[in-house]
């Protein structure tokens, strides 16, 4: 009788663990907290009319620099990185409370630039 109880308890514990493992979210956690590059309403400047700007994450990676490429560098670096940023395809300037701002109309991932507001 004791072995039946222990087998039943083991089976119950196993089924509970399988339930927990199955209910765990099956998502890619590498970019957790950073949504894709999209057009979003800027709440700071959207007072009398909506102002949209590009926000979100794009591609980035780092890898060891190939030896052939390292030989051509004036200051050799062991790690090479490449990245794209969330930038506007089309913009037009508008004025909000006496400040000129860029209202974005379309976004994509492209070469990273430092943008002015």
Curated annotation (Swiss-Prot):
Transmembrane segments: none
Alphabetized SMART domains for the sequence: GHA
Stored InterPro entries: Cystine-knot_cytokine (IPR029034), Glyco_hormone (IPR000476)
Key word Ribonucleoprotein present: no
PROSITE patterns in the cross-refs: GLYCO_HORMONE_ALPHA_1, GLYCO_HORMONE_ALPHA_2, GLYCO_HORMONE_ALPHA_3
Alphabetized UniProt keyword annotations: Disulfide bond, Glycoprotein, Hormone, Secreted, Signal
GO molecular function, one term: follicle-stimulating hormone activity
A GO biological-process term: G protein-coupled receptor signaling pathway
One of the record's GO cellular component terms: extracellular space
Location(s), subcellular: Secreted
SS bonds (residue pairs): 34-57, 37-86, 54-107, 58-109, 85-112
Signal peptide: 1-23
Glycosylation sites: 78, 103
Record's keyword annotation contains Transit peptide: no
Subunit composition and interactions: Heterodimer. Glycoprotein hormones are heterodimers composed of a common alpha chain described here and a unique beta chain which confers their biological specificity to the different hormones.
Reported function: Shared alpha chain of heterodimeric glycoprotein hormones. These hormones bind specific receptors on target cells that in turn activate downstream signaling pathways. Involved in gametogenesis and steroidogenesis.
Family the entry assigns: Belongs to the glycoprotein hormones subunit alpha family.
PANTHER family membership: GLYCOPROTEIN HORMONE ALPHA CHAIN (PTHR11509), GLYCOPROTEIN HORMONES ALPHA CHAIN (PTHR11509:SF0)
Protein name: Glycoprotein hormones alpha chain
Source organism of the structure: Acanthopagrus latus (Yellowfin seabream)
Taxonomic path: Eukaryota, Metazoa, Chordata, Craniata, Vertebrata
């Amino acid at each position: 009788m004791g072995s039946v109880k222990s087998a039943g308890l083991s089976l119950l514990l196993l089924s509970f663990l399988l339930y927990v493992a199955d209910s765990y979210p099956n998502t890619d956690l590498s970019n957790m907290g950073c949504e894709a590059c999209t057009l979003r309403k800027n709440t700071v400047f959207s007072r009398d009319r909506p102002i949209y700007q590009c926000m979100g994450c794009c591609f980035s990676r780092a890898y060891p620099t190939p030896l052939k490429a390292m030989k051509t560098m004036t200051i050799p670096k062991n790690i090479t990185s490449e990245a794209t940023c969330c930038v506007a395809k089309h913009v037009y300037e508008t004025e909000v409370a006496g400040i000129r701002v860029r209202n974005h109309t379309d976004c994509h991932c492209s070469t990273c630039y430092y943008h002015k507001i």
